[in-house]
From Swiss-Prot:
Domain notes: The cysteine framework is XI (C-C-CC-CC-C-C).
Keyword Signal tagged: yes
Official protein name in the record: Conotoxin Ep11.1
Main location: secreted
GO cellular component, one term: extracellular region
The entry's keywords: Cleavage on pair of basic residues, Disulfide bond, Ion channel impairing toxin, Neurotoxin, Secreted, Signal, Toxin
Propeptide boundaries: 20-32
Domain of life, per lineage: Eukaryota
Cysteines paired by S-S bonds: 39-53, 46-58, 52-63, 57-70
Length: 72
């Protein structure tokens, strides 16, 4: 348990010691903005198949239900 806590502390402190700047696109930032894990429903906008919920596909930038698998 102590080893785990020590490892996590090192991961948190190491970037500040090396002078590495943090990214604005972090997991906590995504959670605060509310866009973490969101998907588009039927008729909603999308950019690719992975933006649509479930087995829906992105056709013409709109999520739609299909009988066949999503295309390439």
């Amino acid at each position: 348990m102590k080893l785990c806590v020590t490892f996590l502390l090192i991961l948190v402190i190491l970037p500040s010691v090396t002078g590495e700047k943090s990214s604005k696109r972090t997991l906590s930032g995504a959670a605060l903005r509310g866009d973490w894990g969101m998907c588009s429903g039927i008729g909603q906008g999308c950019g690719q198949d992975s933006n649509c919920c479930g087995d829906m596909c992105c056709y013409g930038q709109i999520c739609a239900m299909t009988f066949a698998a999503c295309g390439p």
